[in-house]
Structure formats: structure tokens, C-alpha cells
Amino acid sequence: MKTRFFALAALALSLAACTQDEPADDNRLPEGEYPVVIRATGLSVEATPQAAPSTRATVDGDWQGVQTVALKMGDAVKEYTVTATDADGYKSATLSRENDPHYWTSRDPITVSAWWPFNKADITQMPAVKVAEDQSKLADFQNSDFISAENRKVEFNNPTLEFTHRTARVTIELKPGTGFTSVAGATVSLVSLSA
């Protein structure tokens, strides 16, 4: 009788030990259970002395109008959906992927890169920055905008990724002043620019 009791007690303990779904002590997580979802920030517009007319993301410092980004984790690059709301003026966004997302494999920080725009024919490569020489047309200005977050650490408990512009927005306003009654015919050149 005692042997049967101890055998049942041992069986009950072993079954109870197998029902825990908690991660192991080494920070590992169950495979395929924790999709990578990231809060994207950054894109602030610096030094804007006057209210400029709004164009579209990201040149105005917000995520409005950006629908997807390329997100690289390890060697794999996947297209992630951008969800932004006006609750914070579109200043932050959630990057997520419904089907086949990247997954956390542990609670340790991960290193990711992300960029927009990207070439759908080859999403694996961050495109070279190409800006229109003449950006006086709105479409040329907008198509010269590139944002990225390169090789950034993302924490499991606070998955935030700060993006920055890969290009600079420069606005030059010419005004007549002392010795100049008109700026008609003036030419402006920016020199010594680099990537």
C-alpha cells in the first residue's frame, strides 16, 4: 500500500512539474509565441522657426502616410505594417506583422535595423539615398525622404526603435536687406555636403 501511495505521489509531482509554461532560467522563450512588435519613434523636425505647411510623413516629423517598413533581424528582412494614430499627433507608430513575423527567442535585447522606403523587388537591402537635385516640386521633395534605424538594440520589456532621417531638410528664405533691394535672380549653392 505504501509503495502504491509513493508511486502515485511521485507521478502527481512529475505531471505538475510538466505543466509550467514559464521560460527557463536562461531567458529563453517558447518558440513562436512572442512576435516582435516594436514602438517606433523619432522623426522629429528640428529647428522649424515658422509654421510650415504640412506635406506628408516623414518630412513633417510624423508617421502619417507611412504604411510599411522593412525590418531586419539577423539575416532575415520582413515587411512590417506601420500603425500610427492621431492620439500623439502621429509622432509614434507600432510596427507589427500579422503573418510570419520575427519572434523573440529570449528576453535578451535584439539588434534590428529598419528603413523606409524600400524596394519591394529586393527588400533585403537598404536603398541608397538618392535625392532629386531640384526639390522645388513637392513630389520631388517627398520622394527624396529616407528614414532608418540601423543596428539598434531593442529591449524585450520596452521594444522601442528610434528612427532618424537619412537626409536633411534645408529651407532657405532670401530677403532683401541692406544694400540689396531685391533677391530676384539670386542663386544659392550648398557646398561640402556629405552623407
Each language-model region and where it sits:
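Sec-type signal peptide cleavage vicinity
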Residues: 2-11, 15-195
